[in-house]
Design a protein with these regions (language model features):
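Helix-biased detector of long, well-ordered alpha-helical tracts
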Residues: 1-218
Length: 218
């Protein structure tokens, strides 16, 4: 016993619905390894999960992390968890637990992976889905702060093909490790003011493919 995490459900929501999301940061981890910089990758992890909650109108409640690693490195883990804590503070959700697995038979020296799991809550009438989107609605884009945590396999391929060393390029070094923006405050502010009918993360496929995912068939 004692391995489960318990949290309160807010009482001010009439018809509460739980929304769950899990994600990782993909091969951005390889950039962190190359630069030996691990204090922001945890922010990325939280962002990838909570940004998937808010597009359905849900307020993030809790977050859990999973870290699998070749060999436990306390300094590296402290930096990763520091980022996770910061991400949770930005998104106003509670870090309620996590798991660290030492797996030398799976990961080679210095290699690791991280995954996150988050649960949010939304009143049923405030859920953002296709049914609320209608003709003459405006499409508004919120600028990102960089490339977030998507497309890093392509980024790394381009770097390798062109023999670019990011350690020697200050601009690339800063841009490629920059943590994913957490959009919780902006989106939930729009939800609470009833100014938004639908929301979508613009990732692989760009504006065209992603916006189409939330448009009703009619």
């Amino acid at each position: 016993g004692g391995f489960g995490s318990i949290t309160n459900i807010p009482k001010n929501i009439k018809n509460p619905q739980l929304v769950a999301s899990t994600d990782g940061v993909g091969t951005k981890i390889e950039i962190a390894n190359e630069l030996n910089k691990f204090d922001t990758i945890g922010i990325d992890l939280v962002a990838m999960c909570v940004n998937d909650l808010i597009v359905q109108g849900a307020k993030p409640l809790i977050f859990l992390d999973y870290i699998s690693i070749n060999k436990v490195d306390s300094n590296k883990l402290k930096k990763i968890i520091k980022g996770i804590i910061k991400g949770c503070k930005i998104s106003n959700c509670e870090l309620v637990g996590g798991e660290t697995a030492e797996m030398p038979g799976t990961y080679s020296k210095d290699k690791f992976d991280i995954a996150g799991f988050s649960v949010g809550i939304v009143d049923k009438k405030k859920i953002l889905d296709k049914s609320k989107i209608k003709v003459n609605d405006l499409i508004v884009g919120i600028p990102s702060n960089g490339i977030h945590s998507n497309g890093y396999s392509l980024v790394r391929y381009i770097l390798k093909k062109n023999k670019i060393k990011i350690k020697k390029n200050k601009f690339l070094k800063n841009e490629l490790i920059k943590p994913t923006k957490i959009y919780v405050k902006e989106i939930l502010n729009l939800v609470n003011k009833k100014l938004i009918n639908g929301c979508v993360n613009i990732t692989g496929g760009g504006l065209r493919d992603n916006i189409n995912r939330i448009l009703p068939k009619n």
